[in-house]
Amino acid sequence: MLKLSTNEIRKKWIEFFESKDHLFIEPKSLIPKNDPTLLWINSGVSTLKDYFSGKVKPPHKRLVNSQKAIRTNDIFNVGLTSRHHTFFEMLGNFSIGDYFKKEAIDWAYEFLINVLKIDVKKLWVTVFEDDQFTNDEWIKLGIIKEQIIKCNRDRNFWDVGNGPCGPCTEIHYDRGERFDPNKIGSKLILEDIENDRYVEIWNIVFSQFNNDGHNNYTELLQKNIDTGAGLERIACISQDVPTNFDSDVFMRITKSVEQFSEYKYDMNEYFHPNVTQNKINFAYKVIADHMRATVFAIADGAIPSNKERGYILRRLIRRTMVLVRRLNINNLLWVDAVVDAIASTMGDFYTYLKDEKTLTKIKMILNKEVQLFEKTLQLGLNIFENSIRNQELDKEITFKLVDTYGFPIELIKEICEQRNVKVDLEAFDAMFKHHQLISKANKANLKVMESQNESLMQLDVDSTFHYEIFRWENAKIITLFNEDFELVDGLDHEDGYVVFDNTCFYATSGGQQHDTGYIIKNDQQFFVDDVFKAPNRQHVHHVKNASLSMNEHVILQINEQDRKSITANHTAEHLLHYCLKHVLSPDIKQEGAAKYPHKVTFDFTYHAQPTKAQLDKLENVLNEMVQSNFDVQELHMDLDEAKAVGAAAYFEDVYKKLKGKLRVIKMGPSIELCGGTHAHHTSEIERIKIVECASKGAGSWRITMVTGHDNLAKYIHDLYVDYLNEINHLKVNLDINDHKLNDLYNAFANWKNLSIDDYDLLNEKFAELKQSLINFKIEFDKQNAKQAIIDIKNTFNTQLTNKRVHVFKNTDNKNIFNALNELINENQDTLFISFNLDDNKIQYLLAINEKFATTNQINLNKYIKELNTISNGKGGGKPYFVQGGTSEQEKLDELLTVVDKWVINA
């Protein structure tokens, strides 16, 4: 077999199939376009699905590609096996209604034998047991008959349950006995046992049937070919190296990391296993793999965050950092070095990796994320150090480190192993799963009903929503459900769900909150507190304590003021989106938005937090657009027409599913597809104030705006009241004798004629007053603490023995701690023991002079263990200073009795 670089193999693949009249398709972004079923492009065919489904006409019936992909379902196998990756390249050749089995098989053989010069005796193939044609074709070409394995449906039939499907044939390469240490031989491939000897390098799927969803199969009129060959696998066998991670692409990355570590990678460890070297190799493999995925993902527009693909990216980076620590790399220079190595190795094909602007962006985002986690890591490590009890890490602390500080669980395991600390991973796992269940339950809402409730799925009645109407006089009840979504004929003073033939209630969608209001029947009013869309688009109204019957006619009245506020906020959100892209950066990507009566929030990704100056400029431009009094136009067109006129379709996959013309909202330069309610003119918004721009995680931001004179007046008043309450809370129990501080407080507390124009000044004065109070309180507490320490010392100094014990009640343990620290330096041979009764707990401290303890071989851990045993408590510390506690306050007398028996001998 020819020894080829990864780049050479890819080039030969593309050129070979181009010679067979295939059109080369450039690799697409890892972020799927308009495919909500995927977080990442995860196969070579993922980007071609619309061609195979017939939604889009392919540019040619024969296609070839080398598509980058990410899969994270096997993340914990990366580095443990020879071939698992998160990022990989899939070589593919495809026929869309053109050639079929014969050509696909013949060309696969030709490429492997004539181009790569593989010895035919090294090839083994699997075929579907009923696919005689494929079996015979392989024999005709020269594959040894005994090396063709007939397999059942589970192994060699591609079927997703509904839609195109068919048999497949897999090509395996025999790497020889050195990759079969147990000398199992052909049984490995015959019985499909995971192994490194027989490596699958190519899979050809013959899409020739349609499954109707009930396993009834019919021949497709248009038969297709879908193939996939793993580039990294072919490179591994071509270069004759033990694992994919030893091939040229990975080794360049590994070498870039090695320069910063005293630990070196050794590919010979595969044949000569060594536990220590295996851990080192594992670290290098995972770093190389995860960094490839990270660099390409960021280049394609992904940003680390706490949700969806951003969360996966963050997880990959943090897992990498754990293993960088294992290699004892203590600086951050490795980040840029790895990015440069990946760009150098793969930039000839992925040319954008050599673009200076792209490289700078990747390095900036990556370094920022690494530095962010470094800080979090240090905070978490401090918690870890302070939480170890009896060489054991509590499951609650483990959970906190994972959930709050983002520690990968493998980092906790590694630190615990290094410190010889026990950690109950099973208890943590159970707790984590319980937390996930609670989180899911808390997030469960009517959207779950929409997708899973059978009654709603089968609801097939005509119901019309009227955008511009606030009151509908003659709405007919056409469907009634009780609280359990069971169809009923009536509700009798109970909660339930109602569908009308016509409604003016907006249903929650597109981030816009539903209307609230009343169903009016004669002289009765029933409150509607929620409205959502059923799967078939009807508006379903949740009503409280209602008495209603099927086919009754009622009046519907929404909360008009709330609707007008939401409408203004939704219109303002469109303007904000436009301004962000034109004032801040065209790279802004919307993550979500929420429109309420009192505010609007807008979530977006951007590599840096917008500055105060940028936000001020943004606000000024927004208000200029409001004052421009643009007409808000409602247009109707199909998706292609909308895109042709420049309409932004930020959730295009949703719009593709809708039938008929789509609703397009245009106001001045802003034009978007949207199903929400809007003002008629931008001047109806009155005024926009950006009140917050907060981080939602690295690279993810949320802008909050308030609009309209009345809402702004209420907002500034409520903000002032909140600030004043916080200030008054800080002042409690403070005897302020500082005139300047009193003047500052009085000026704030008696602020008159406050308006939204005072927003920045209010924040400034609040921050100044709050900090002044905090500083005063710190000094106040410091003085109190000094006196408390003196009082505690005096309490102990009334005793003249070399063992002094005292029971405190509701005393600050920190003051006791500091008092004992001073006492053991002033009393060289005395043991001090304190018990502090606080909140149904006992906290105990034992302290003795360090030098005295060392000289006399005293270890207070022996004494505190005795207290822990009696009271079922926990605690420990240094030989001369230990602390612990118990929730069993009733054990105090027993503790005092045992302490009384202790003898301290010099």
Curated annotation (Swiss-Prot):
Keyword Metal-binding on entry: yes
Compartmental location: Cytoplasm
Which keywords appear in this protein's UniProt record, sorted alphabetically?
Answer: Aminoacyl-tRNA synthetase, ATP-binding, Cytoplasm, Ligase, Metal-binding, Nucleotide-binding, Protein biosynthesis, RNA-binding, tRNA-binding, Zinc
Q: Does the keyword Cell division apply?
A: no
Q: Which GO biological process categories is it annotated with?
A: alanyl-tRNA aminoacylation
The record, for InterPro entries, names: aa-tRNA-synth_II/BPL/LPL, Ala-tRNA-lgiase_IIc, Ala-tRNA-ligase_IIc_anticod-bd, Ala-tRNA-synth_IIc_core, Ala-tRNA-synth_IIc_N, Ala-tRNA_ligase, Ala_tRNA_ligase_euk/bac, DHHA1_dom
Which cellular component appears as one GO term in the record?
cytosol
Q: How is the cofactor bound?
A: Binds 1 zinc ion per subunit.
Molecular-function GO terms, alphabetical: alanine-tRNA ligase activity; aminoacyl-tRNA deacylase activity; ATP binding; tRNA binding; zinc ion binding
The UniProt record gives the binding positions of Zn(2+) as H570, H574, C674, H678
Enumerate the cofactors the protein uses. Answer: Zn(2+)
Listed EC numbers: 6.1.1.7
Highest taxon of source: Bacteria
Signal sequence annotation = none
Catalytic activity, per the record?
A: tRNA(Ala) + L-alanine + ATP = L-alanyl-tRNA(Ala) + AMP + diphosphate
Record remark: domains: Consists of three domains; the N-terminal catalytic domain, the editing domain and the C-terminal C-Ala domain. The editing domain removes incorrectly charged amino acids, while the C-Ala domain, along with tRNA(Ala), serves as a bridge to cooperatively bring together the editing and aminoacylation centers thus stimulating deacylation of misacylated tRNAs.
- Family the UniProt entry places it in: Belongs to the class-II aminoacyl-tRNA synthetase family.
**Function (record text):** Catalyzes the attachment of alanine to tRNA(Ala) in a two-step reaction: alanine is first activated by ATP to form Ala-AMP and then transferred to the acceptor end of tRNA(Ala). Also edits incorrectly charged Ser-tRNA(Ala) and Gly-tRNA(Ala) via its editing domain.
What is this protein identified as?
A: Alanine--tRNA ligase
| Organism of this sequence | Ureaplasma parvum serovar 3 (strain ATCC 700970)
